[in-house]
Amino acid sequence: MALGLEQAEEQRLYQQTLLQDGLKDMLDHGKFLDCVVRAGEREFPCHRLVLAACSPYFRARFLAEPERAGELHLEEVSPDVVAQVLHYLYTSEIALDEASVQDLFAAAHRFQIPSIFTICVSFLQKRLCLSNCLAVFRLGLLLDCARLAVAARDFICAHFTLVARDADFLGLSADELIAIISSDGLNVEKEEAVFEAVMRWAGSGDAEAQAERQRALPTVFESVRCRLLPRAFLESRVERHPLVRAQPELLRKVQMVKDAHEGRITTLRKKKKGKDGAGAKEADKGTSKAKAEEDEEAERILPGILNDTLRFGMFLQDLIFMISEEGAVAYDPAANECYCASLSNQVPKNHVSLVTKENQVFVAGGLFYNEDNKEDPMSAYFLQFDHLDSEWLGMPPLPSPRCLFGLGEALNSIYVVGGREIKDGERCLDSVMCYDRLSFKWGESDPLPYVVYGHTVLSHMDLVYVIGGKGSDRKCLNKMCVYDPKKFEWKELAPMQTARSLFGATVHDGRIIVAAGVTDTGLTSSAEVYSITDNKWAPFEAFPQERSSLSLVSLVGTLYAIGGFATLETESGELVPTELNDIWRYNEEEKKWEGVLREIAYAAGATFLPVRLNVLCLTKM
């Protein structure tokens, strides 16, 4: 049976191909042509039967004017678009690009050619981006294509804070704006962002446009979930906004929200229509009072402005992000829960990770063979984590492969600092590679004052700090320097009290804390703290065990220490380096380290970052 169906399908495709090829051949050789399509200054000879078979629009035109069926004038359609449509009807081939797809989409809608329409929808969906999502959304609404409009709206909601800054956002109609901001899928951490976007929209345009928008503002306001706004913001910003104060109806809505904050919920009666209203007057007199009250209660609805359903973006949590070659796992120390973020094996084993102040996560390291670069094909992986799709995105590879380097960020740039070459000789480096996040290009930055590897790089207030490590003589360094990208210069700071490499370090409570690591005499458990304002180092509570490669993470005001390597004695009495996967927390009040978890399996071979992630995008483990 299956073979029969397969054979029938094969025969059908063969006949379709034969028919289409034959029609195209007759078109190319000018055989049996009985129609001319005119668009602008160009003429396109073709076959009426082909147009009528593929398009209800053309069929209706031919049947409505049989005496003029040999000539068809198409107004307001460019000749190039007509040429592409006709080429597709005869060949099933169409060349889409960013410049032509919207015109082809509109033509397919007008001429009622569903196949071209579907191809354009798929093309636009796959290429949705910040620069075109609003235009695609409006196009989907204009052409009544729900699939495209919904896809574009979902993209806008996912990137709302960025899209709301676009000038095209201010050109939305009231209905288009409501379709976006009424969505539960809006990716905003705070409702304040929605309010501010609506106010910018209402105050934009010329005087006539502003007047029209302000008339629509009470309706638009129903989609702003003011009940999610803090009481202080409601009173200081919303209630005092000039556009709100100018409309008594908006002030009444704000008062309803303030009452709701105090526990007094306002409800509205649901309006009855037609017979329901008339029938209510003739209601059975024997209906009990309790039943009447129940019906009345059922007819009451909550005003839209009192909607307190959380948006998609409001499920962000501060988590410890553990990145390894096996995948990425997020750990919530407050609830002692783990979430799977990604099972991708794209991350190289020997990597360095970084989270920017905008909460973007990057990974660099490993070896990548770039076939396009004939002169120097060896480079390093450079990846960015996509929070929405929970996957790693390949970025332009790092041109200078190295190990034992550090990552820092400042002013929209990411810095790869120092390290050792992954080449013969493993030369120590003082070079600094700079990745521009706006142009997506690598370049060289100002070199370090000295060569270093096994150091730590930290970022704070658009400055890049380099601490410790080892020099070309393999001796540990206590040096510390800072790079100011505004001045394009490195400056040496006060040195650490203990020279060390492969240690843990983080910025915590405005200070830099370093702990454990390797010294010239072995492992250490010592820790010290650096005052950025005073440029001074002071002792800090030592870690309970001597370790190297300890990771320090500052998360929501709490300092954590994770993993690392310690020298442990085996059953045979031999001392061997052993990786530990435990988690410790520093007790600020008692000034001591406390154990949190003896072992967390996902920490093996991982790097650790404090990241804000949406738990709705993650899978609880």
Curated annotation (Swiss-Prot):
Kelch repeat residue intervals: 360-412, 413-462, 463-510, 512-557, 559-613
**Region of interest (Disordered), ranges:** 265-295
Q: Provide the protein's localization.
A: Cytoplasm; Cytoplasm, Myofibril, Sarcomere, A band; Cytoplasm, Myofibril, Sarcomere, I band
List GO BP terms, alphabetically: negative regulation of proteasomal ubiquitin-dependent protein catabolic process; negative regulation of protein ubiquitination; positive regulation of proteasomal ubiquitin-dependent protein catabolic process; positive regulation of protein ubiquitination; proteasome-mediated ubiquitin-dependent protein catabolic process; skeletal muscle fiber development; skeletal muscle fiber differentiation
Which tissues show it? Answer: Highly expressed in fetal (19, 23 and 31 weeks of gestation) and adult skeletal muscle; expression levels tend to be higher in fetal compared to postnatal muscles (at protein level). Also expressed in fetal and adult heart.
Which residues fall in a compositionally biased region of kind Basic and acidic residues?
Answer: 275-292
The UniProt entry's GO CC annotations, sorted and at most eight, read:
A band; Cul3-RING ubiquitin ligase complex; cytoplasm; I band
Q: What is the effect of changing residue 500 to C?
A: In NEM8; uncertain significance
What does the UniProt keyword field contain? Cytoplasm, Developmental protein, Disease variant, Kelch repeat, Nemaline myopathy, Repeat, Ubl conjugation pathway
Q: Which GO terms describe its molecular function?
A: ubiquitin-like ligase-substrate adaptor activity
Q: Which residues form the BTB domain?
A: 33-98
UniProt cross-references to InterPro entries, sorted A to Z? BACK, BTB-kelch_protein, BTB/POZ_dom, Kelch-typ_b-propeller, Kelch_1, KLHL40_BTB/POZ_dom, SKP1/BTB/POZ_sf
Ranges where the BACK domain occurs? 133-239
Which Pfam families does the entry mention?
BACK (PF07707), BTB (PF00651), Kelch_KLHDC2_KLHL20_DRC7 (PF24681)
User: Secretion signal: which residues?
Assistant: none
Which cysteines form disulfides? none
State its role.
Substrate-specific adapter of a BCR (BTB-CUL3-RBX1) E3 ubiquitin ligase complex that acts as a key regulator of skeletal muscle development. The BCR(KLHL40) complex acts by mediating ubiquitination and degradation of TFDP1, thereby regulating the activity of the E2F:DP transcription factor complex. Promotes stabilization of LMOD3 by acting as a negative regulator of LMOD3 ubiquitination; the molecular process by which it negatively regulates ubiquitination of LMOD3 is however unclear.
Which disease is this protein implicated in? Nemaline myopathy 8: A severe form of nemaline myopathy. Nemaline myopathies are muscular disorders characterized by muscle weakness of varying severity and onset, and abnormal thread-like or rod-shaped structures in muscle fibers on histologic examination. NEM8 is characterized by fetal akinesia or hypokinesia, followed by contractures, fractures, respiratory failure, and swallowing difficulties apparent at birth. Most patients die in infancy. Skeletal muscle biopsy shows numerous small nemaline bodies, often with no normal myofibrils.
Q: Which family does it belong to?
A: Belongs to the KLHL40 family.
PANTHER family xref list? KELCH PROTEIN, KELCH-LIKE PROTEIN 40
Subunit-structure text = Component of the BCR(KLHL40) E3 ubiquitin ligase complex, at least composed of CUL3, KLHL40 and RBX1. Interacts with LMOD3.
**Name this polypeptide is given:** Kelch-like protein 40
Q: Which organism is it from?
A: Homo sapiens
